[in-house]
Structure formats: structure tokens, C-alpha cells
């Protein structure tokens, strides 16, 4: 027997109904904000991801040579692909460009709660504006996307890569990305493990104390940003903190400030982020951490051969969000069975087909008995698959111009004229 590939899953009808519900909730909000859907190839040249995705992501690539000897990889994220698409075809398009996607990604990592080797993300990219208003628009959409699913218990934590760069300079550290990677892991480590990593990196006691001070600068913007002003003295840092003040003020006007926190220890795992970064956390007992994140990447398009073009965006981790929504009871029980099941008795198949066609054309989910079962077994099947109504098409009834409709929940039966079947079904289904 051939097994399923490790780290992947099969989605059954009930699973797909739940996923589709989440996708559509998020899609509605994306489109309400003026974003338009795109999809890029699942494969790209490996070099695209090696240029700027980050050491950890590059290590996790599903990379191989195709039959032409070209190095290709399954996409580990969409931002690089979107930047490539922009450079290829849209540099002269009106700005800003607002795109969204709902797509699957691949990373060779150890499967665990909320983490798989094939996973889905819903995300947006806003290309062509370096204004803090663009950051506010994207972060507000990030918050609204979670709210659209009924989730309320979450926070969006905002950090800044420029401030981390300035902090590395304050410590005299030349390998700022190396320091960021350690800081970014702090929530996954004990205090002792975190300090040991900083020591191995080459920091002394006084520098480690400053790092510990930095990672504690987190909380509501009004409380945290004054602390950041005390820690950072350079002109560049002051300008960035001023931007964070403006950002949080704008987010208040969007009506989402209650979900916003500042966390200056956030770096995110991708090397292409250049300024504001953010991630969403929802408390849970499932072992799931971040449920999505994003940030500004003003240099990526230039690295891929385009003209310097600012951009910002985010991705929501569906495999992380969906279990939390289920755990909190926020996903409606899906209706995977037919709304109507039509059972033809002897020689009544053509009439049954005609009835099914009329219902289907009214977008009523209709199935038909195709196995030739006797009435009792066909009714058992209809009950097992969750049909709400059964239409029994018998020869004597049809000769009188009627059929029998049975409500499977109440057990009530109705003799209904052939010409009134659609209206009666809609009435019983409360359409």
C-alpha cells in the first residue's frame, strides 16, 4: 500500500467545507479593501528564493533539478513570487498595486501542531507606496481578516527591523541579521537557552542585559513607545519611532487599535523585511504560536532586477488559524450531504432525473439514487449522508401528477404536484 507523503494531508468533504468557509470569509474582506486575486506558478527557479528568503527558509526548500537540468523549487512563500511577477510584467502599471492570493506553499520542516510540509496561506501585497498610510491599510486589513472569521481573542504585535538594526549598532554588532535571528527565537526558548545563544553569538554581560531590556519592550503602544524613545537615541531611530506613533494613531481611526501591541523583539524569519513587521497571536492550548504575519519589504523588487519599489504585505497561516477557530467553536457545522435526495421507484428514473435537473438549476444541492436500491435501503442511505429532504418518485403517484416529499428530520410527508416541487422544496428548506 502506498502511503501519503509525510507532512501532507487528505481533505475530506467536511474538511473542505470548513476550509472553504474560512477562505470565503477572508476573501470577502480582501476584496472589500480593493485587493484583486492573483495566482503564480507553484514552481519557481530556486535562485528566486535563495536571493532573500532567509537562511532557515532556504534550508527547507523542496528543491530539485528538472529534466532540463534547471534548478527549481516549490514555493515556500508567495511574496518572492509576487515580486517576480511585478518585475516581469507590472513595473509600468499604476500604483499602488493591490493583490491578494489564497494558495498552497511547501517547506521541508518537521511536522507538528499547525505546521505541515504542504500548507495554505491567504495573503496580500501592496506594491508602490512607502507611506505609513499603506502600512496602516495592510495591518488594518490583517486585523479585519481575523475578525471576519469570528475570532476576537488575538493581538497583532508590531516591531521594526530598522530599530533592530539600530540596536545592533548600539551594541557594536556587525552581524545584525544573525542577532535578529536569535532575538526572533526568544519565545521558543527558556531564559537560560536564550542567554546561552547570545553568549555563543559573542555578546558580553552588558550587551546581553540590553538585549533582555529590548525584548521586554512590548505592550500597548501608548505604554511602550515612550520606553522605546528612552532606549534609542539616534536620529534614524527617533524617526522610526515617530512613524510607529503615526501608524498606531491611524489604526485607531481604522477601529482596530484594541488588537494592536508593540513588540520590539519581533524580527520575522525572512531577510527581505526592511522596516515595520508584525505577527498575530491567539492564545490557545494547541501549541500553536503565530497565526500569520507580514511587514514592509522595500528592497526586494530591486534585488529581483526591478526599479526600487516599496511594498508591504502579509500572509495568514490557514493551518494555524483553522484549528484555533475549531477549538473555539467558531466554524459552523458544514452541510456536506445533499439538501435533497431523489429516489425513483421502478421505471421512474427519467422522471426522477427531470426533477433533479430542475432543483439543481435552482442551485439546490440534489443527489439521485443511482444504485438501484429498494426504497428502504435508499432511505437509509439518504439518512446516513444527511439529506434534509427525500423525494420519492413512484409510478402511481406520477400518474396522478404528484410525488411524495419526506422531511427527514420531522418525518412528515407531503404529496406535491409535479409542477410545484421546486417551490415546495424551497419552502421546506426555508429558501
UniProtKB/Swiss-Prot annotation:
Positions of transmembrane segments: none
Domain of life per record: Archaea
EC primary class: ligase
One GO location term (cellular component): cytoplasm
GO molecular function per UniProt: ATP binding; histidine-tRNA ligase activity
Record keywords, A-Z: Aminoacyl-tRNA synthetase, ATP-binding, Cytoplasm, Ligase, Nucleotide-binding, Protein biosynthesis
Subcellular location: Cytoplasm
InterPro entries: aa-tRNA-synth_II, aa-tRNA-synth_II/BPL/LPL, Anticodon-bd, Anticodon-bd_dom_sf, His-tRNA-ligase, HisRS-like_core, HisRS/HisZ, HisRS_anticodon
Any single biological process term in GO: histidyl-tRNA aminoacylation
Catalysed reactions, as listed in the record: tRNA(His) + L-histidine + ATP = L-histidyl-tRNA(His) + AMP + diphosphate + H(+)
Predominant localisation class: cytoplasm
Pfam families: HGTP_anticodon, tRNA-synt_His
The enzyme's E.C. designation: 6.1.1.21
Family classification: Belongs to the class-II aminoacyl-tRNA synthetase family.
Protein name: Histidine--tRNA ligase
Amino acid at each position: 500500500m502506498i502511503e501519503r507523503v509525510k507532512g501532507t494531508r487528505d481533505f475530506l468533504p467536511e474538511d473542505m467545507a470548513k476550509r472553504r468557509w474560512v477562505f470565503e470569509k477572508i476573501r470577502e474582506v480582501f476584496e472589500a479593501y480593493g485587493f484583486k486575486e492573483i495566482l503564480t506558478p507553484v514552481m519557481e527557479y530556486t535562485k528566486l528564493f535563495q536571493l532573500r528568503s532567509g537562511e532557515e527558509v532556504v534550508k527547507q526548500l523542496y528543491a530539485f533539478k528538472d529534466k532540463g537540468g534547471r534548478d527549481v523549487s516549490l514555493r515556500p512563500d508567495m511574496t518572492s513570487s509576487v515580486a517576480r511577477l511585478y518585475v516581469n510584467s507590472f513595473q509600468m502599471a499604476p500604483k499602488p498595486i493591490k493583490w491578494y492570493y489564497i494558495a498552497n506553499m511547501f517547506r521541508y520542516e518537521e511536522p507538528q501542531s499547525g505546521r505541515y510540509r504542504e500548507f495554505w496561506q491567504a495573503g496580500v501585497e501592496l506594491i508602490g507606496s512607502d507611506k505609513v498610510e499603506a502600512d496602516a491599510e495592510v495591518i488594518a486589513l490583517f486585523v479585519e481578516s481575523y475578525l471576519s472569521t469570528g475570532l476576537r481573542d488575538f493581538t497583532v504585535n508590531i516591531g521594526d527591523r530598522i530599530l533592530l538594526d539600530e540596536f545592533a549598532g548600539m551594541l557594536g554588532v556587525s552581524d545584525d541579521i544573525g542577532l535578529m535571528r536569535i532575538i526572533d527565537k526568544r519565545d521558543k526558548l527558556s531564559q537560560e537557552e536564550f542567554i546561552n545563544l547570545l553568549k555563543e553569538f559573542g555578546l558580553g554581560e552588558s550587551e546581553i542585559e540590553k538585549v533582555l531590556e529590548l525584548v521586554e519592550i512590548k505592550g500597548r503602544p501608548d505604554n511602550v513607545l515612550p520606553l522605546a524613545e528612552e532606549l534609542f537615541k539616534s536620529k534614524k531611530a527617533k524617526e522610526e519611532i515617530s512613524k510607529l506613533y503615526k501608524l498606531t494613531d491611524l489604526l485607531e481611526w481604522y477601529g482596530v487599535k484594541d488588537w494592536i501591541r508593540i513588540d520590539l523583539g519581533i524580527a520575522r524569519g525572512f531577510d527581505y523585511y526592511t522596516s515595520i513587521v508584525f505577527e498575530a497571536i491567539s492564545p490557545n492550548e494547541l501549541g500553536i504560536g503565530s497565526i500569520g504575519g507580514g511587514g514592509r519589504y522595500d528592497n526586494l523588487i530591486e534585488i529581483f532586477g526591478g526599479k526600487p519599489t516599496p511594498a508591504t504585505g502579509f500572509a495568514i497561516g490557514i493551518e494555524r488559524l483553522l484549528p484555533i477557530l475549531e477549538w473555539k467553536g467558531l466554524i459552523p457545522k458544514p452541510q456536506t450531504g445533499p439538501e435533497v435526495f431523489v429516489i425513483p421507484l421502478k421505471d421512474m428514473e427519467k422522471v426522477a432525473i427531470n426533477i433533479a435537473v430542475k432543483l439543481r438549476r435552482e442551485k439546490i444541492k440534489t443527489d439521485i439514487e443511482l444504485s438501484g436500491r429498494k426504497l428502504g435501503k435508499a432511505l437509509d442511505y439518504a439518512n446516513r449522508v444527511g439529506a434534509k429532504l427525500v423525494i420519492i418518485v413512484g409510478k402511481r403517484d406520477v400518474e396522478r401528477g404528484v410525488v411524495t416529499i419526506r422531511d427527514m428530520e420531522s418525518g412528515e410527508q407531503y404529496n406535491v404536484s409535479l409542477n410545484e416541487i421546486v417551490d415546495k422544496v424551497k419552502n421546506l428548506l426555508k429558501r
